[in-house]
């Protein structure tokens, strides 16, 4: 009798162990499957973030890419033809149709540097252009028409409407370039080697 009862006790224990062993894999499988949506969401978010981050980079690249195209061969009068944002040679007549008196807009100048073309009060092309590269650390300085000055967004340097430095840390004024209109109508730049009319000093860039 004692042996029989021990067999009866052992049987339920063995059955219970079998049931536990069958249940455990199911629990693990459920846990694993519950992680799948999280991973999918994470991957989707990564793609969205990567795509979103690429937009401003692409925009900036398109905006400044025009200033890295090879310079034009020249304007026929010894100068180098100025180019617009699309890389086309600038013709004074066409430019003045869309750029009014007092306008200062970027073009591609000597050595491919971004250079401001200036429209005078009587709606002609100014006799000089301004290199837009800040003399502090080389940022491109935007023209702020509302304040009638150039203001560097990198470290706060400021230049007046003629490109003369009026606030540091930039140590020097923006470089000048001669700007002329050739007989063909092309706007051309050439190196400024004379005295800087803004400071009365020799040009630091020559």
UniProtKB/Swiss-Prot annotation:
GO MF annotation: an example: 2 iron, 2 sulfur cluster binding
Stretches assigned to the Rieske domain: 92-188
Note: This protein is 1 of 2 subunits of the cytochrome b6-f complex that are encoded in the nucleus.
Major location category of this protein: plastid
Main function: Component of the cytochrome b6-f complex, which mediates electron transfer between photosystem II (PSII) and photosystem I (PSI), cyclic electron flow around PSI, and state transitions.
Compartments (UniProt record): Plastid, Chloroplast thylakoid membrane
Record gene name: petC
Residues engaged in binding [2Fe-2S] cluster: 134, 136, 152, 155
Enzyme Commission code: 7.1.1.6
Protein name as catalogued: Cytochrome b6-f complex iron-sulfur subunit, chloroplastic
InterPro entries in alphabetical order: Rieske_2Fe-2S, Rieske_2Fe-2S_sf, Rieske_Fe-S_prot, Rieske_Fe-S_prot_C
Catalytically driven reaction(s): 2 oxidized [plastocyanin] + a plastoquinol + 2 H(+)(in) = 2 reduced [plastocyanin] + a plastoquinone + 4 H(+)(out)
SS bonds (residue pairs): 139-154
Alphabetical list of NCBIfam families matching this protein: PRK13474.1 (NF010001)
Transit peptide feature, positions: 1-29
TM helices/strands, residue ranges: 39-68
Membrane topology: Single-pass membrane protein
Domain of life: Eukaryota
Matching SUPFAM superfamilies: ISP domain (SSF50022), ISP transmembrane anchor (SSF81502)
PANTHER family reported for this sequence: CYTOCHROME B-C1 COMPLEX SUBUNIT RIESKE, MITOCHONDRIAL
Co-factor: note: Binds 1 [2Fe-2S] cluster per subunit.
Known partners and oligomeric status: The 4 large subunits of the cytochrome b6-f complex are cytochrome b6, subunit IV (17 kDa polypeptide, petD), cytochrome f and the Rieske protein, while the 4 small subunits are petG, petL, petM and petN. The complex functions as a dimer.
Source organism of this protein record: Chlamydomonas reinhardtii (Chlamydomonas smithii)
Cofactor: [2Fe-2S] cluster
GO cellular component: chloroplast thylakoid membrane
UniProtKB keywords: 2Fe-2S, Chloroplast, Disulfide bond, Electron transport, Iron, Iron-sulfur, Membrane, Metal-binding, Plastid, Thylakoid, Transit peptide, Translocase, Transmembrane, Transmembrane helix, Transport
Family (UniProt): Belongs to the Rieske iron-sulfur protein family.
């Amino acid at each position: 009798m004692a042996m029989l009862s021990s067999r009866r006790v052992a049987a339920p224990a063995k059955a219970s162990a079998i049931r536990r062993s069958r249940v455990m894999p199911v629990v693990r499988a459920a846990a694993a499957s519950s992680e799948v949506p999280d991973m999918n969401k994470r991957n989707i978010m990564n793609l969205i973030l990567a795509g979103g981050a690429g937009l401003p980079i692409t925009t900036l690249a398109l905006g400044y890419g025009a200033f890295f195209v090879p310079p034009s061969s020249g304007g026929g009068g010894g100068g180098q033809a100025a180019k617009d944002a699309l890389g086309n040679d600038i013709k004074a007549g066409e430019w003045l149709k869309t750029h009014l008196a007092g306008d200062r807009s970027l073009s591609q100048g000597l050595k491919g540097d971004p250079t401001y073309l200036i429209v005078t009060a009587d709606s002609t092309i100014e006799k000089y252009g301004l290199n837009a590269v800040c003399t502090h650390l080389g940022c491109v300085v935007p023209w702020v028409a509302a304040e009638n000055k150039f203001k560097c967004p990198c470290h706060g340097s400021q230049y007046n409407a003629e490109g003369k430095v009026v606030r540091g840390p930039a140590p020097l004024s923006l470089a000048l370039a001669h700007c002329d209109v050739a007989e063909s109508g092309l706007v051309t730049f050439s190196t400024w080697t004379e005295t800087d009319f803004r400071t009365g000093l020799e040009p630091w860039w020559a």
